[in-house]
Amino acid sequence: PYTIVIPPPNVTGMLTMGHVLNNTIQDILIRKARMEGKEACWIPGTDHASIATETKVIKMLEEKGINKNDLSREEFLEHAWEWKEKYGGIIINQLKKLGCSCDWERERFTMDEGYSNAVLESFVKLYNKGLIYKGHRLVNWCPVSKSAISDEEVVHKEINGQLWYFRYPIKGENEYLVVATTRPETMLGDSAVAVNPNDKRYIKHIGKTIDLPLVGREIPIIADDYVDPDFGTGCVKITPAHDPNDFAIGKRHDLEFINVMNEDASINENAPQKYIGQDRFDARKQIIRDIDQNGLLDKTEEYVNKVGFSERGDVPIEFYMSDQWFMKMNDLVKPAIDAVKSGEIKFHPEHWVKTYNHWMDNIKDWCISRQLLWGHQIPVWYHKEDKTRLHVSVSGPDDIENWEQDKDVLDTWASSWIWPMGVHDWPEENEELNKFFPTNTLVTGPDIIFFWVARMIITGYEFLDKKPFTDVYFTSILRDETGKKLSKSLGNSPDPFDLFEEYGTDAVRFGIMLMAPQGLDVLFSKERLEIGRNFMNKLWNACRFISMNKPDNWIEGQSIDEIELRLPDKWIISRLNRAIKNYNKQMDRFHFNEAAKVLYDYIWNDFCDWYIEIAKTRFYSNDDSKMITYNICIESIRKILPLLHPYTPFITEELWSFFKIENDKDLIISPWPVVDESAINEKID
């Protein structure tokens, strides 16, 4: 068999040009495999996309005047399922309109019952192995969704801001240390000031105490090698509950971890009364004013800072102390690293191996819990009488009335990471799983190499001791003609279905493949779509011309007599077989745009502009050349159309009907053309 699993589109809206590129490539691979006689299986489906979909549903509810917080979990999930049914259905219909020849009866959704059980089973198995644990740790926090998010869901933006220098008085002395910060509001949670142990300026102060301004808390001056004496003033305020580097220092020095923010990033009761309840940025302004009024503002500098934003919430994240579920990744990655290094799994283009290895070699424990409603609820129950008693299973405890389930859901990627086997009802042993797993090729974007690709490889080896796929093809990034990434938010991404109406679906498919070289970004251009449309017209006209000039005495299946062939005939047959050979070579290397160019060049230049012109004069003659020419045209067309079919399925299937002979099948299941090496003539080619 030849198997592909679709990277399931999120049920958050409509398909984009990126989806068109990705799914056209998959369709090319699956149609070719099917015509080669393989049992081709392409599993379609959609992803619940936890945080992305929940954000959309909340916005939809707000437009109706409904606040999420006024709904019960069950009521909110009803709205989310309605959203899924609407947009999931639209996406599937759009994939069909694109021409995707999926096994539609095998369609899956990452929250359908069987798949959900598989997701929860993966959690239980890893928990029982000691690879999943709950910890109170610093996480990336989105104040909009009020949830932890992963490093990969944080977008860093350069922001023009300020660097404020505050004077921190040393207790009992008429001296102070100057610390710099871009986030003054976090000073409310400071636990220490750190200096380098070898910094001669401050050695005498190590062990002394700071009177923390505005707060009145006494905090120590500590020595730590992390501090760079040449950066800034050489003094660093330490806020272990609100900064990852400070968190590590806090652990080393057993400092107090003081969280001064609520889940929405407003200031909490651990701060002085006047700041409680203020938004973090309002508190920042107030703190700067108060520091200045106390004569403790040393100076302010303009500063360009890289700030992490929540990808979905589009607000600056906070580093936030929170109880979360984590997965120990170091214990899982070795087989996945070895598989790619050994070539058991191949990346196309190969340069992505370096990126993959770097991430895997520096992997951290994965925060897999999210404080959301839409998703797979974590299969952990706490006893109502004793919260330290846990029950972990897919179905829950028998006396469930005495237990309360964890309210958090799993990170979306902790469900889609089992996709290649979950779609075949893993962990149940079954014929489908044995037949179609491992899959052959994964087609995906390089932007989710960590989110998804690496994690699927990990699960394949962890749960089945098999690679989940043999080849990974990373698609190009689509950019506009100025080099900006195509994006709906930027307004530079056309609606693909408007383009289908304007140019035709086949023309868009062929045009986008012409402009998508392996390993390079794609400069999207409507001119290429024009080329695609003109090419479809050229092919259509050539086929119509040939079909209209069938000789009256033509016999179906008549072979070409080598002796009767003239030089132009031998030349076009040689060019045809060379084109088939080159096309197959490019396809085997995953060079889809080069394969498209081979077909374009042969059909437009050799066949249409050259041989068809000769055919025009021969078709109006009464000698044997008319029959020979028609036979050669038929042989060319009956090999051209199958080669072109994976790229342009609609027009080729229609044209195939013009030239069908007895016992012919539909083009989609017709045999793949075979190269006749003996027909390739180096001398005349």
Segments (PLM) and residue ranges:
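Conserved phosphate-binding loops in nucleotide/dinucleotide-binding enzymes
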Residues: K157, I238-A241, F281, E318, ...
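Active-site-adjacent "gating/activation" loops or surface patches in catalytic cores
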Residues: R217-I222, K407-F437, N605, D609-I612
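Conserved short loop/turn motifs at secondary-structure junctions
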Residues: G18, G45-H48, F76-W81, E105-S116, ...
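N-terminal, positively charged nucleic-acid-binding surface of large information/translation enzymes
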Residues: P1-N198, T239-R252, E256-A271, R280, ...
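Acidic, turn-prone loop/beta-hairpin segments
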Residues: D47, P143, S150-V155, Y382, ...
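Active-site and channel-lining beta-strand-loop segments
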Residues: F257-D264, V307-S310, P379-Y382, F469-G491
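Gly/Pro-rich turn-and-neighbor structural signature
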Residues: G114-S147, E153-V155, R167-K171, W359-W413, ...
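Catalytic adenosine-cofactor/nucleotide-binding cores of aminoacyl-tRNA synthetases and other
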Residues: F309-G313, I477-T482, L486-L565, I661-N663, ...
